Amino acid sequence: MAARAAGSGGWEVVKRSRRPGASSGGRGGGGDRRALGEANGVWKYDLSSPIQPTSTLYERGFEKIMKRQNKEQVPPPAAESKKPVNKKQPKKVTAVASQNQKQGPFRSLEDALKALDVAALQKELDKSQSVFTGNPSVWLKDLASYLNYKLQTPRMEPTLSQYPHDYPYSLVSRELRGIIRGLLTKAAGSVELFFDHCLFTMLQELDKTPGESLHGYRICIQAILQDKPKIVTSNLDKFLELLRSHQSRPAKCLTIMWALGQAGFTNLTEGLKVWLGIMLPVLGIKSLSPFAIAYLDRLLLMYPNLTKGFGMIGPKDFFPLLDFAYMPNNSLSPSLQEQLCQLFPRLKVLAFGAKPESSLHTYFPSFLSRATPSCPAAMKKELLASLTQCLTVDPLSTSVWRQLYPKHLSQSSLLLEHLLTSWEQIPKKARKCLQETIQSFTLTNQELLKKGSGSNEHVVTCDTACKGLLQQARGPRPPWARLLLLLLVFAVGFLCHDLRSHSSFQASLTGRLLQSSGLLPVAQQVCAKLYSYSLQSYNWLQETLPACGSYLLAVVQPSLQLAWTYIYATFSFLSAYCASYLAFFSDSLAGVLQRVQLPEALHQLFHSLKELLLLFYHSVLLPMWHLLLAALAQVQEHCHEACRGEMTWDCIKTQFSTAAHWTWLCLQDVTVAFLDWALTMISQQ
C-alpha cells in the first residue's frame, strides 16, 4: 500500500472485504478518524524518500474526536485485534479518556498557548518515540498534529500581515521551543520531508469549509527555517512550480509565499534568494503583488547593513524592478509603485555591490537604452542620475558609451544636456576622461552631419551640448578687456601720483626710469604725436559740437517740452488722486474691521499701519517728489541762463568743468572727513 501511495502521490483508503459498508464508503460501527498521511496532498514532484504510511500513537487516541473529518473508514479497535489488515503494524492502544472530549476554538492564540499542557505534549511525544522507534517522521507529524489541534482559533488571513514577522513562533514559551527544537534535532534526517508535510497539510486545510486554523503547522515551519533556511532556497524551482500550480487560488499562493518567506528572516542572503526566486516572478499579479512588496520592504528594513546581500541582484533582476517602479500603466497600482520607488535606492546599493567602480559599466547600456525623450519625468530623472553615477564611478562606462553613441543619439543628447547642467557637481578626477569622450563625440558628430543621416536633429543637439561641455571643461575665458582697462587706470593713476609728488616730469620716477633706459626720446615723440592728435580732435569738437548741439536742440526741444508737460501732468494727476484713494481705502478698511469684529489688538495694529502709511506718504513721498521737480526746474533754468539759449562749446566746456570741479571737491571733503573720523576713533582706542 505504501508503494502504491508513493507512486500515485496520495494515500489509499483501507478497505475490508468482510464489511461491505467499508467498501461502499458507508459509516462503519468503529467510527471515523483522519489518518495522518492524508495531509500529504497531491504534489507535482515525486519525493525521493516518501514517508511511510504508518499510523501514529497520537491519532489512535482521537478516533472518536475526528469523526467529522471523514477521509477513511477504519474498523473498530476490537475487530482489528482479531483480524489485522497489516501484520507489520503494532498493536493499537487506547488514548487517555480525558483527551476524547472535543474542545472549542480559543479567542486568541495567546489564550490557546496559555492553555496548552506542555507536559502532556511531552508525554505524547515520548509514547510516540517508544512505539515508533525507527520512524522519526511519525514523531514530527505527531508534534504538528498535536499543536495544530490544541491551538485552534478563528482562522486568520494567510499572510498574517497585521503581526510581526516571527508570529506565531514569537509567542511560544521557552519550554515549548526547547521541546520542538529537541525533536527536530533527533529527527534531523526527516526535517525536509516534515516541512513539505506541514506545507501541504496547510494547503489541504484551506480547501475545507470550515477548516482548522494553521498555527501548529506555522510554528513548526518557523522553527525549521530558523535553523535550516536552505531547505527552501535549495528547492526554489520546485516551490515556484507549486506556486504556479495554485495560481488561481490566491489564498493558497499567499500561504505558500508566507511559508517560504520565513527563510529570509534569519539571513539576508537567503531572504533575497526567496524573493528573487519566488516573489519576483509573480510580481504584477494583483492578488500577490502587495505581499511581495511588503515582504521586500520588511526584509530590507530588518537589515540596515546590506553588505551580506551584495551580489544577489544582477542586471537581469534589477531592470525589471526599475520598470515596475517607474513605468506607468503597468500591472502595479500607483501606491505599490510609490512603495517600490522608496525601496529603489537600497536595491541600487545591493545591485551595484561592494565594488561599483568595476561593475557599473555592465548596467550602463540598459540605463542608456531606457533614457528616451518620451520616458516619464521621474524615470528620466532616475536614469540620468544613474548614468552620471556610472560615468563618474566606473571609468569603463565611457568606453561603453563611445560604442553605443552612434545608435543612441536621442538618449545621448539627454545625457549630454544633463551633464552640461550638472558639470560643477562632477568630480574633477572624472572630468578629464569625460572631456576626452566628448572630444571623440565631436568628431563623430561632424561625420554624421556630413553624411546627412535621418537623425540630424539629435546630432545637432548632441553637437551643441558637446561644444558647451568642452567650453566648460576648458574653463572660463579670462576677462582680457576688463584686465586691460584696470591696467590702464592703474597706470594713469600711478603716473598722476608720480608727477604730483615730484612736481615735474624730469624729477619724477617715471621720467628718471625712461631716461636711464633710453626710452625718453621715444616717449617724447609718442607724447608729441598724442598731443597733436588730441589738439586736432579738440579743434574738431570745438567747431562741430556747437552746431550739432544747436541743431539737435532745435529739433528735439519741442518734443521734449511736450513730453515733459505730459509727464508732469500725469504725476500731478496721480499725486492729486493718491490721497483720495488712500482715504477711501482707509474708510473701507475701517468698515470691514467693524463688521468682522476682530480683536482689539488687531484693531490697534491696523490703525497704526494706516497712520504709518499716511505719515510715509505726507512726510517722505510728497516732499521727495516736490524736491525732484524743483531740482529739474533749477537745472533747466541754470542751463538756460548759463548758455543764454544757445549751445556753444565754451558753455558746454564751462558747465562740464564746473560739475567736475564741484564733484571733486565733494569727494575730497567726504574723504577728509572720513579720514579725520577714523583717526579720531583710533586715537581714542
Curated annotation (Swiss-Prot):
The keyword Membrane applies. Its main location: endoplasmic reticulum. Residues 1-36, 66-104 are annotated as: Disordered. Glycans are attached at residues 267, 305. InterPro entries: TMEM214. GO terms for cellular component: cytoplasmic microtubule; cytosol; endoplasmic reticulum; endoplasmic reticulum membrane; Golgi apparatus. The modification N-acetylalanine is found at residue 2. The chain crosses the membrane at residues 479-499, 612-632. GO terms for biological process: apoptotic process. It is a multi-pass membrane protein. Constitutively interacts with CASP4; required for the localization of procaspase 4 to the ER. Belongs to the TMEM214 family. This is Transmembrane protein 214. It comes from Rattus norvegicus (Rat). The lineage of its organism: Eukaryota, Metazoa, Chordata, Craniata, Vertebrata.
